[in-house]
């Protein structure tokens, strides 16, 4: 039943409205209900599977990008896990016009730097959702910043990105913990690059 509701909503709403006004609140609601014990584990898994299927179909529809658009690498550091939120950020970025290289979750920091230089990315987006290992992740983010080309920007996303506020001034790293702010930052960077 959720599949049908999601499909109908996708057909009616624009991609950004669907993600920001409909899907993100739905994911938050599911997480809240699970944490309160009002939803069974199996129900949560089935709901998230429907949402992931919906996001994958959106991702496939938006995959074609122009040859000359700005490039972005998105992934997460070691000990991080994939989140539906990360997939929503990917779709928002594609909708703005970025060419995305998604390298997945649990990627060593030097491999993220290598991927960014290989595709000549203008932006690296790191998803941080796991509250553990903050000191190690700060070291790894600093390493990525130091090895990045001068033209590369870095944006931290995810539920735990606020824990890294001290990096914003020290290393010129942006933090975006909501989809609307992320979209606005991408649009601004896109206009500066083009």
Segments the model singles out, each with a brief description of its role:
Residues 37-40, 46-194:
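C-terminal regulatory/effector modules of DNA-binding transcriptional regulators
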Residues 1-63:
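Long amphipathic alpha-helical segments
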